[in-house]
Amino acid sequence: MWKAKTCFRQIYLTVLIRRYSRVAPPPSSVIRVTNNVAHLGPPKQGPLPRQLISLPPFPGHPLPGKNAGADGDDGDSGGHVTAISWVKYYFEEIYDKAIQTHFTKGLVQMEFRGRRDASREKEDGAIPMRKIKHNEVMQIGDKIWLPVSIAEMRISKRYDTIPSGTLYPNADEIAYLQRLVRFKDSAIIVLNKPPKLPVKGNVPIHNSMDALAAAALSFGNDEGPRLVHRLDRETSGLLVMGRTKESIDYLHSVFSDYKGRNSSCKAWNKACEAMYQQYWALVIGSPKEKEGLISAPLSKVLLDDGKTDRVVLAQGSGFEASQDAITEYKVLGPKINGCSWVELRPITSRKHQLRVHCAEALGTPIVGDYKYGWFVHKRWKQMPQVDIEPTTGKPYKLRRPEGLDVQKGSVLSKVPLLHLHCREMVLPNIAKFLHVMNQQETEPLHTGIIDKPDLLRFVASMPSHMKISWNLMSSYLV
């Protein structure tokens, strides 16, 4: 009897536990609604503080190159220099409207003069600053801070003079684009693309290379040249375009991973095997090995905002979809100012291949590549730049010359531009092989065609900011 009661109590308790556990409320949690979408849990971390850059301390009036008593439209009349005048002077390549917008939105700040008010010092050691208006009168030693994004707006005005309703460039733009041409024959056009000029334009971009080529680079043909490969907007160097449908098809095969080696013509296959592209890049740090082969597949992922994509190494990332990516590299010299020059030869053609391989595979991101090397840039700028001379073993450092023009965009500037340049390229002579392959077997080849080389080699000079970095690192050593 006692055992039956005990068993009944156990069953009763079990039933009660099951019953009330089902109706028990779940643990408390926060429900957030944004854009008609409900989210559980605490909110995500908000945006990080805006990254800022500082202008040099204000040197005084008049500014270099300005007349002391001249009245100007920048608001520096009457013997005073305003804040917007100083910003326009420093960022002379940026539109006045963009600079005015930064002032209107309250994005321009100034350090408290002389840092005299100790009570304003923040506990975390941050520099105390205040927002200023465009007509703030500058005093000697004043220091202005702006968002880093303003330096990314340095686009030459000659690219933005096309009216929004038309894609036809004006005479100055046509002349400028034609000066970029380094080689031209019946099959191809080779240009030395400057940085910040987009190659492939989207709907709102009217100044891309493909949009301007039809009007500026047709050179008498009914149709303009077409792109056969791409360079990133910030990347400079050799860019090849096809002038005819046949040459475009051949170039597409040449720039593919198969390198066009699928023809019965042995000379063509041999020329395709000899084809290569060579880039020069300035990287932060120095690879452990002086030369080598990077074989690291890449995957493209979409970030949380649903709009921005990013290329990552597929190895160890858990992504199944990936593309093979192979790059040869060679270090060109010793590390100077915490950086070293590297020669890159891509064997495959993948989006952002060189930038990701340098940043993630070698651990040495390219100078000016803030997408794949922002944290390394931040740490690099905070470190003392002292290096060891490889032959003598003595320390040396880079002499930092005075003057704004010397440092703009170079390795010494606050925000360096991307230091990646397609310097050299070897291609099959498309015009010659098209003539040979289209020639009837019974017809003899013209002597002038036979004498032409099977390969064409091109070399493009570096843009100004990379030339400055090269000269500084090779000539200004203490």
Swiss-Prot record:
A Pfam family hit: PseudoU_synth_2
InterPro entries: PsdUridine_synth_cat_dom_sf (IPR020103), PsdUridine_synth_RluA-like_CS (IPR006224), PsdUridine_synth_RsuA/RluA (IPR006145), RluA_PseudoU_synthase (IPR050188)
GO cellular component, one term: mitochondrion
Residues forming the catalytic site: D232
GO molecular function, one term: RNA binding
KW Repressor (keyword) present: no
Subcellular location: Mitochondrion
Signal peptide boundaries: none
Disulfide bridges in this chain: none
Gene3D superfamilies recorded: Pseudouridine synthase
Keywords noted in UniProt: Isomerase, Mitochondrion, RNA-binding, Transit peptide
Family: Belongs to the pseudouridine synthase RluA family.
Name this polypeptide is given: RNA pseudouridine synthase 3, mitochondrial
UniProt organism field: Arabidopsis thaliana (Mouse-ear cress)
